[in-house]
């Protein structure tokens, strides 16, 4: 906000970053949250604006903006399948990077689908990156199953048609998600 806007439009103090003392800068209140930078509790619900959780992800708006630099209106900033709060509080991953350990798998897929560690490229320390592993033995890597074919990396035959997902993709040319393709 420029000084004129602060004084004339919002009745805030140009030399004070957070006029109402709610933990959010005046500019963020106006441009991101559409809250009133002169009133601590814009909506009058008894929760000051900085403590609100606009996206209901478990992190306060002030925490998202001031600590993690994430958008308090977006529940999963990096679209990896984990909420920003899950990344920060549970898995200790980066809520702005979908693949924190850079192994070719989204953090959410590692934590919720494969049960691998989204902070370690090679969770079982066998020399193969988690994204290159093929735990179901179907001939497709975890990364291919999750990122390319949308098949189940824990199922040898995702559509239960008697052909492995890898055979359908690499040999037969059928759809590993459609039993009759």
What kind of region is each of these model predictions?
Residues 1-181:
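Extracellular calcium-associated, cysteine-rich motifs in secreted modular proteins
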